[in-house]
Amino acid sequence: MRKLLTAFLGVSLLLGAAAANASPEQDRKQLLEYYKNKFPNIKFNDYVNGALNLNPDALSQYNSIMEFPPYDSQLDQGKKMWETPFKNGKKYADCFPNGGKKMAGNYPYFDENIGKVVTYEMAINSCRRANGEDELAYNDMKTMGILTAYSRSLSDGMKMSIRVEGEKANAAYERGKATFYQRRGQLNFACGTCHVQQVGNVLRTELLSPALGHAVHWPEYRAGENVTSLQVRYSQCIQNVRGTPFKEGSQAYNELEYFHSYISNGLPMQTPVFRK
């Protein structure tokens, strides 16, 4: 533990000093360069595979599993939800450009009109409200999770394209970045502890994955057929370090996701995926 914290502090100073006044694009390029130096054999597009890139046997097993994905039945449920008309006869596809295809990579975005970050799940609930339906709970994986696992798959292959433009958007991005690097919980860890400073190491049997590429494949199916959204995963991670998580759909998580997604700009969307 002492070695882990020492290494964390060292790399934190290295990255933090250079990124203190960096623009979002400078942040992204700096992280990419950091990972390229650490893992010179990983091609950019392969970062969608996460920690699997660091374990050839696990990647081979994953590719075999994905020939017959264990979550197909739940994906079918999500498709049915997406295509079932609301009481007024309209569908989810009517709320989004191109019928919901090749557009999820634009989320989250900062909406100047309401002054806050809008996630894809928020857009789903906005669609429901506009059509006289009740909102779905952001942490309900049997509804919101399954629905978005399917609907985000309609954007597979689209490159992540998050924009941070304007003073208020930059402020939201910076708050998300601060949350990413803020240590919390009894273990005093941050998101960046595992996914930047200690990336590639093993912690509690888990091979730690790069933050680059995280945001392009959620929701994902973990431990078989349990669908998990990115923000639910945030809560799980904070609980793992014995901290108090924020609420799914909160400003803190939305802005964290904004930062987290921006650094994966240019990577292809791939939803859902299977992880152990």
Regions found by a protein language model. Give the residues of each.
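Bacterial N-terminal signal peptides that target proteins for export
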Residues: M1-F8
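Residue-level detector of functional hotspots within protein domains
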Residues: F8, V48, K177
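Bacterial N-terminal signal peptides
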Residues: F8-G16
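Sec/Tat signal peptide C-region and signal peptidase I cleavage site
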Residues: A18-A22
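Electron-transfer interface patches adjacent to heme c in soluble/periplasmic c-type cytochromes
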Residues: S23-S73, T84-I146, S153-G157, Q182-K276
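Short, charged low-complexity linear segments at domain edges
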Residues: Q61-K80, M158-K177
